Design a protein with these regions (language model features):
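Residues forming the flavin
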Residues: 1-72, 117, 124-541
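A conserved beta-strand/loop capping segment in the N-terminal third of enzymes
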Residues: 69-88, 93-133, 183-187, 336
Length: 541
């Protein structure tokens, strides 16, 4: 750190929240430093879809889309309800007030935003619900990271010039000219990047990459392989951190404050099991997501809240062991999810949080579909009809009759036969009378618009039939350190721990146990990190 001023604001974590917190700190006169325990940066944010849910954002205004703070607040009140002070009126209001300003100021620093204009809120019929509140980063050339590209956390997904609103059209690319044109457009943009010697980043990777470029432009030091060991408290205030290094423990000054943005505890099985009844084995979160900030915060008296909450998500385990957090596989017509009794129990096209939560008490279930479904749609990245390899490696179970399929899967045969008969009867009328699948615009977003009369709900009639296991996974845990509307961490008695802030999945969620829209994890992580840094610098809303 030769030549660098002594840091006065320590940010823990290099996900989107931590990077934004450091940027806000520098823009408001602080001397931040970012520490990251892993040898790579980006956290779970880099592995995510990269959506940022910001009601009443500047891009909506630019596009002439009506929204307001009041509509956003009405929607949060309707979807979240009363879950205690983690989602107080003051915290909801702070999020809605500061989010649009954060978006605008990051754009001034060079961040390229775009809107997903077709993406609905997850409960679009609730008061204040809207379409198009989700933002994302534009496709970005990874080579602009310079040497930081070598240490960026990467997923197994290939680098493509994808966009959020293009994703729902990929699985139906061979069903409509519009969807096929979208696929060709994605491929064309990807090739254009490559022909210019560039590497296209999308989704979570463009989000963290663009933020890291701003961090480097502002001269903010980032230290990898530097796990937080403890917080130093002097006279009731956090004034420094102790980190672990190859040379032993080291103290880093934080005279103005510390911002914890170190993620959740999805991958600490021993810590998680008594709190949530699951170990995290079905979570695609970062392997470094082990609750360090939670434990270190508690050591200085911090209060925890909503520790049972997670961003639940039905997942499948691919033959190579990769956890696939897919969406369209369960929303396209011709597929259903059943439990071991052969029964449906949820609207499969609903929010992934709702579907995943419904699966929790049932354990692993089965996604069942017919040949027509398999011949029409992509399954993950596997094109239609290309089925043999997935049958040969055991990922798909197949049979010529439903009773035979049930026997192979350990599903109650009578239950499955009765369920499919019921589904086929309802699908012929286009109305899911049991779970209302396809009754709102969110259900239809990942549907097949060429399938009539219901783009998200169809029968299972053509043999052979198929099934694959689906598990109650999650994208991240949500519970964490209780914080107020300024992102200040609170003690059990509600008093403020001076100098300590928290945002993201190590803070108790302003969204409570629900998930209002795409980007309702990254949005609060970034906005409350922004709020924390500005408050620490003496700037208030």
């Amino acid at each position: 750190m030769a030549g660098q001023p002594e840091p006065d604001f320590v940010v823990v974590g290099t996900g989107a929240g931590g990077l934004v917190g450091a940027i806000a700190a520098r823009l408001n006169g602080l001397n931040p430093i970012i520490i990251e325990k892993a040898p790579v940066w980006g956290g779970t944010s880099a592995l995510s879809g990269g959506g940022v849910w910001i009601p009443n954002n500047p891009l909506m205004k630019r596009d002439g889309v009506e929204d307001s703070l009041e509509a956003g607040l009405a929607y949060l009140d309707a979807t979240i309800g009363d879950v205690g002070p983690a989602s107080s009126h003051e915290r909801r209001l702070a999020y809605l007030q500061e989010g649009p300003e954060m978006v605008a100021q990051l754009a001034e620093q060079g961040f390229g935003w775009r809107r997903a204009p077709r993406y609905p809120d997850y409960y679009p019929d609730y008061p204040g619900g809207r379409v198009g509140r989700t933002l994302e980063g534009v496709n970005f050339d990874a080579k602009r990271l310079g040497p930081w590209l070598n240490t960026m956390r990467r997923s197994a997904m290939p680098d493509m010039a994808l966009s959020t609103d293009a994703a729902p059209q990929i699985p139906t690319a061979f069903r409509s000219m519009k969807s096929f044109a979208t696929l060709l457009s994605v491929m064309g943009r990807t090739i254009a990047f490559r022909l210019k010697g560039q590497v296209p980043l999308a989704l979570g990777k463009t989000l963290v990459a663009q933020l890291m470029v701003i961090v480097q432009k502002l001269g903010i030091p980032v230290r990898l392989n530097t796990p937080l060991h403890s917080l130093v408290e002097e006279n009731g205030r956090i004034t420094a951190v102790v980190v672990k290094t190859a040379r032993g423990e080291e103290r880093i000054s934080a005279a103005r404050g510390v911002l914890l943005c170190a993620g959740g505890f999805a991958k600490d099985a021993a810590y998680r099991l008594p709190l949530q009844g699951v170990t995290g084995e079905w979570s695609p979160a970062s392997p470094d997501d082990t609750g360090d900030a939670h434990k270190i915060g508690v050591a200085v008296g911090a209060q925890l809240a909503l520790m049972d909450a997670a961003t639940w998500f039905p997942v499948s385990i691919m033959p190579d062991g990769v956890i696939n957090a897919g969406i369209w596989e369960r929303t396209l017509p011709g597929s259903i999810i059943v439990d071991p009794a052969g029964h449906r129990f949820v609207n499969e096209a609903a929010s992934y949080v709702d579907v995943g939560q419904a699966m929790l008490n049932r354990g692993p279930c089965w996604l069942v579909f017919d040949s027509r479904y398999r011949n029409r749609y992509f399954f993950g990245s596997t094109p239609p009809r290309m089925t043999k390899a997935l049958v040969d490696n055991g990922f798909f179970v197949t049979a010529s009759t439903l009773p035979e399929l049930a026997a192979k899967c350990g599903i109650d045969a009578d239950g499955l036969v009765q369920t499919v008969a019921r589904v086929n009867d309802m699908a012929s009328r286009g109305v899911d009378e049991d779970f209302q699948r396809g009754n709102n615009v969110y259900d239809l977003y990942y549907g097949d618009p060429t399938h009539k009369p219901n783009a998200a709900f169809g029968g299972l009639e053509q043999t052979p039939f198929f099934a694959t296991r689906v598990y109650p996974g999650d994208l991240s845990t949500k519970g964490g350190l209780m914080a107020d509307e300024h992102a200040r961490v609170l003690r059990e008695d509600g008093s403020v721990i001076d100098g300590l802030y928290a945002a993201g999945n190590c803070a108790a969620p302003v969204m409570g146990r629900t998930y209002p829209g795409a980007g309702a994890t990254l949005g609060p992580a970034m906005v409350f990190a922004w709020i924390a840094a500005r408050h620490c610098a003496g700037v208030t809303a």
